[in-house]
Amino acid sequence: MAPVLPLVLPLQPRIRLAQGLWLLSWLLALAGGVILLCSGHLLVQLRHLGTFLAPSCQFPVLPQAALAAGAVALGTGLVGVGASRASLNAALYPPWRGVLGPLLVAGTAGGGGLLVVGLGLALALPGSLDEALEEGLVTALAHYKDTEVPGHCQAKRLVDELQLRYHCCGRHGYKDWFGVQWVSSRYLDPGDRDVADRIQSNVEGLYLTDGVPFSCCNPHSPRPCLQNRLSDSYAHPLFDPRQPNQNLWAQGCHEVLLEHLQDLAGTLGSMLAVTFLLQALVLLGLRYLQTALEGLGGVIDAGGETQGYLFPSGLKDMLKTAWLQGGVACRPAPEEAPPGEAPPKEDLSEA
């Protein structure tokens, strides 16, 4: 049975392979650490921005999967550092001979699987952010006025912090505030004629104005911020509603958050792809180094050539061997007679 992808490794190539694996393993550990930082940062961002995502959004699964993949990649890199360093010293390598094989299997199945899952999520989930942000922001703006309603008391504070931090206003622009009641009914005077007319003129009984909250104001603007009666050209003679308003944030929060979260997901996906490549190289190199050293009894500087390989035989032969071994293991052992006891003899009847 011929081995799969054999590679002849003389003395110097074996040493260079071990040294190269030591460097690649450190790079893999570093990449795993960077993935941990990136996924942790994305988790923190989603903890603050989760209010503005739809409850059915699956995007938070991405940093969780990436966190697990980064931890496994970091562990695989550290194992590679230890194994490659020990392989250069015949006195340090024997403890690794029994555990390196199972570690390679675990790193290939667990680490590789997690990286593939994380990379797939990084490519698929950002596309669902558009609808999730749209639904979440509609709900957040609708509850802006509910400062005394249980479950929505923090909506105003969260929306104000969002608009001030990300320099945005409304969902797609400041005019989105014209279609929602953002002033709490507690601060409205039902006896005021203007208030009563606005409420009665709305089908849903909402108090709608052509104004925006204070958090939409741009503090860097040299002019006073215009918050009220923005659609009335007579109220502000120098303000043209058809021109961009320099006093208010120009972008909507939907566009800003979508770009921000997609950039974070893109960075995380790139790191997962690089880590997958590094982990594949490290695991392949460790496998060749392990099988080469097994042929030399674990001594890397032994004279002569040795052969490294991925599998000792083809897939068909491996399955056949495993089947035969399993059949032997499952076959019941023959019962043995106790020592000192002769098997009973059958009585022969006389003819």
Curated annotation (Swiss-Prot):
Q: Which domain of life is it from?
A: Eukaryota
Membrane topology reported for the UniProt record: Multi-pass membrane protein
Tell whether Iron is among the UniProt keywords: no
Give the residue ranges for region: Disordered.
331-351
Which biological process terms from the Gene Ontology are attached to this UniProt entry? camera-type eye photoreceptor cell differentiation; cell adhesion; detection of light stimulus involved in visual perception; photoreceptor cell outer segment organization; protein heterooligomerization; protein homooligomerization; protein localization to photoreceptor outer segment; regulation of gene expression
Q: Which Gene3D superfamilies match?
A: Tetraspanin (1.10.1450.10)
Identify the GO cellular component terms for this protein.
Answer: photoreceptor outer segment membrane; plasma membrane
InterPro entries listed in its UniProt record: Peripherin/rom-1, Peripherin/rom-1_CS, Peripherin_LEL, Tetraspanin/Peripherin, Tetraspanin_EC2_sf
Which UniProt key words apply to this protein? Cell adhesion, Cell projection, Disease variant, Disulfide bond, Membrane, Retinitis pigmentosa, Sensory transduction, Transmembrane, Transmembrane helix, Vision
Q: Which GO terms describe its molecular function?
A: protein homodimerization activity
Topological domains, Lumenal: 45-64, 126-263
What role does this protein play? Plays a role in rod outer segment (ROS) morphogenesis. May play a role with PRPH2 in the maintenance of the structure of ROS curved disks. Plays a role in the organization of the ROS and maintenance of ROS disk diameter. Involved in the maintenance of the retina outer nuclear layer.
Protein family according to the UniProt entry? Belongs to the PRPH2/ROM1 family.
Q: How does it assemble?
A: Homodimer; disulfide-linked. Forms a homotetramer. Forms a heterotetramer with PRPH2. Homotetramer and heterotetramer core complexes go on to form higher order complexes by formation of intermolecular disulfide bonds. Interacts with STX3. Interacts with SNAP25.
Name this polypeptide is given = Rod outer segment membrane protein 1
Gene expressing this chain: ROM1
